[in-house]
Curated annotation (Swiss-Prot):
Part of the 30S ribosomal subunit. Contacts proteins S4 and S8. InterPro entries: Ribosomal_Su5_D2-typ_SF, Ribosomal_uS5, Ribosomal_uS5_bac-type, Ribosomal_uS5_C, Ribosomal_uS5_N, Ribosomal_uS5_N_CS, Ribsml_uS5_D2-typ_fold_subgr. Belongs to the universal ribosomal protein uS5 family. The N-terminal domain interacts with the head of the 30S subunit; the C-terminal domain interacts with the body and contacts protein S4. The interaction surface between S4 and S5 is involved in control of translational fidelity. One of its GO terms (biological process) is translation. GO terms for molecular function: rRNA binding; structural constituent of ribosome. GO terms for cellular component: small ribosomal subunit. The gene is rpsE. Gene3D superfamilies: 3.30.160.20, 3.30.230.10. This is Small ribosomal subunit protein uS5. It comes from the Bacteria. Residues 13-76 form the S5 DRBM domain. With S4 and S12 plays an important role in translational accuracy. Located at the back of the 30S subunit body where it stabilizes the conformation of the head with respect to the body. Keywords: Ribonucleoprotein, Ribosomal protein, RNA-binding, rRNA-binding.
Amino acid sequence: MVEFVNPKSLGELEENVVAINRVTKVVKGGRRLRFAALVVVGDKQGHVGFGTGKAQEVPEAIRKAIEDAKRKLITVPTVSTTIPHDVLGEWGGGKILVKPAEEGSGVAAGGAARSVMELAGIADVTAKSLGSATPINVIRATFDALTSLKDAEEVAKLRGVSLEHLAE
């Protein structure tokens, strides 16, 4: 079970609109247009969330998506500027492989996964999207990967090494 973070306990949250889709519903009288927004929010200090929103107008869809994202904030365990270990996340047809990277190498991730990593405050990471390239599937797979991460102390204990040797 994932524990969500209260957004009021955090500082300023940054938002990034990942995708806006125009959705059409065909009814007897013609077509009904709506907009669906996909947004990622984070504080760049280990907390990140994503949300979706639908509305008749784009700004309203974005506002709903931001509210949804703030309700689904998670904490991401980090070691210095990267993640503690390799992890594979899956959601639907989308898979993502996330690996820690050397300090100073930056975020090597494409599209939707990049915004999740940056807003989570992970500065050095490599991510490869496998399978579905749909932004929502990539983001959900990324969140699956990030929620299955173990914290650095737990990884060091499992491997039988000290915390200092883990970062090497």
